[in-house]
Design a protein with these regions (language model features):
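Nucleotide and nucleotide-moiety/phosphate-recognizing core
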Residues: 3-92, 96-124
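Small-residue (G/A/S/T)-rich helix-start motifs and N-terminal tracts that mark the onset
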Residues: 1-49, 54-55, 59, 149, ...
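YjeF_N-associated NAD(P)HX repair module
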Residues: 83-205
Length: 205
């Protein structure tokens, strides 16, 4: 899903830079990199994970990316232009639990690079640092002087592909600006039998 939308959004891209976190959101980025490389794009991945600690699905995607010839680098590639594309696959909904996440230097550096990139950004599931339930930025990112002192300094994606379900945070608070154009893919999942998460009070019988 990510790779298909990337091709549609940036059909003339020569280079796609994908910033990947250590979890499953990063795994989605790695999978997209493998496919885009196979489809003739030059893909450069900066991965904060490792094959030893990655979830099984992310590890499998890492193997496919390597086999496809994806370049792994510590920083964003030089020469990105407005026709190219950046993909934010760093955090996803990893902040939804409300548990504190240490904003380490590597993460902050990549967030800043996405913020400064001349190419547009496609976020996977939700822009990194945005909380999926509230649409507010993670306090530890806002407060960190290495990245910025206010939500306005955090990067905004031009497009966001949200997967499986629509996240409330994409449409509330800072999310409306941070997410850009929101695209949705349910990945073929049938959620019709899922228990309702809320009920409408006073609904007609």
């Amino acid at each position: 899903a990510v790779a298909r939308l990337a091709m549609a959004l940036a059909p003339h891209a020569r280079t796609v830079w994908i910033a990947c976190g250590p979890g499953n959101n990063g795994g989605d980025g790695l999978e997209a990199a493998a496919l885009l490389q196979q489809w003739g794009r030059r893909c450069v991945v900066t991965w904060l994970g490792s094959s030893e600690r990655a979830p099984a699905d992310a590890r499998a995607s890492w193997h496919r990316a390597q086999e496809a010839g994806v370049v792994f680098a510590d920083t964003a590639p030089q020469g990105l232009g407005p026709q190219d594309l950046c993909i934010d696959a760093l955090l996803g909904i990893g902040l939804a639990s409300g548990k504190p996440r240490n904003a380490d230097t590597s993460l902050l550096t990549l967030l800043q690079a996405l913020h400064d990139a001349p190419a547009p950004v496609l976020a996977v599931d939700i822009p990194s640092g945005l909380q999926a339930d509230t649409g507010t930025y993670a306090p530890e990112l806002i407060a960190d002087s290495a990245y910025g002192t206010g939500a306005g300094s955090l990067f905004h994606a031009q497009n966001t592909l949200t997967l499986l379900t629509l996240k409330p945070g994409l449409f509330t608070a800072s999310g409306r600006d941070a997410a850009g154009t929101v695209w949705f893919d349910d990945l073929g999942a049938d959620l019709s039998n899922e228990a309702a998460s809320a009920w409408l009070a006073g609904a007609p019988a």
